[in-house]
């Protein structure tokens, strides 16, 4: 996975009022935490954060921090992000400092690939699970996990245990969790002419 670089600054003051003032200047308040360090309050330009999590990797992008005193050069991933429910603006971000040698737990989106045979027969595709919790090394985090639905017939489902996963990926979800199914009635054959 591609590593991205993002500039941050340390934040001296905390609180609602300070956070509001930062957001008014298009700056997102955040925190960096992880194994072996105390949580550190930071701030990042909203446009820089949006650009960093856009495109390949998304929220699971490996981010090398630039600036921020002792945080300079640390590698982080986005652990949590709060958005304004109406505008979609990022209100706050939590970064988790990671080591490239230790496994991490992340959410990876599922992408349905192909047109299901059951849909061609008049059924309806019902996606039940949109992402999986996985554990892997940071450099092995997949952008998404593809689910091939091409051979899925009416009345059938695909479960977590049936997925073909990239090497080094361990799924933390229950293996019996359904991902996608096809609902509907199969087309009836035309009655034979007498």
Curated annotation (Swiss-Prot):
One of its GO terms (molecular function) is 5S rRNA binding. Keywords: Ribonucleoprotein, Ribosomal protein, RNA-binding, rRNA-binding. Gene3D superfamilies: Ribosomal protein L25, beta domain, Ribosomal Protein L25, Chain P. The lineage of its organism: Bacteria, Pseudomonadati, Thermodesulfobacteriota, Desulfuromonadia, Geobacterales. GO terms for cellular component: cytosolic large ribosomal subunit. Part of the 50S ribosomal subunit; part of the 5S rRNA/L5/L18/L25 subcomplex. Contacts the 5S rRNA. Binds to the 5S rRNA independently of L5 and L18. This is one of the proteins that binds to the 5S RNA in the ribosome where it forms part of the central protuberance. Disulfide bonds: none annotated. InterPro entries: Rbsml_bL25/Gln-tRNA_synth_N (IPR020056), Ribosomal_bL25/Gln-tRNA_synth (IPR011035), Ribosomal_bL25_b-dom (IPR020057), Ribosomal_bL25_C (IPR037121), Ribosomal_bL25_long (IPR001021), Ribosomal_L25_dom (IPR029751), Ribosomal_uL5_bac-type (IPR020930). Belongs to the bacterial ribosomal protein bL25 family. CTC subfamily. This is Large ribosomal subunit protein bL25. The gene is rplY. HAMAP family: Ribosomal_bL25_CTC. One of its GO terms (biological process) is translation.
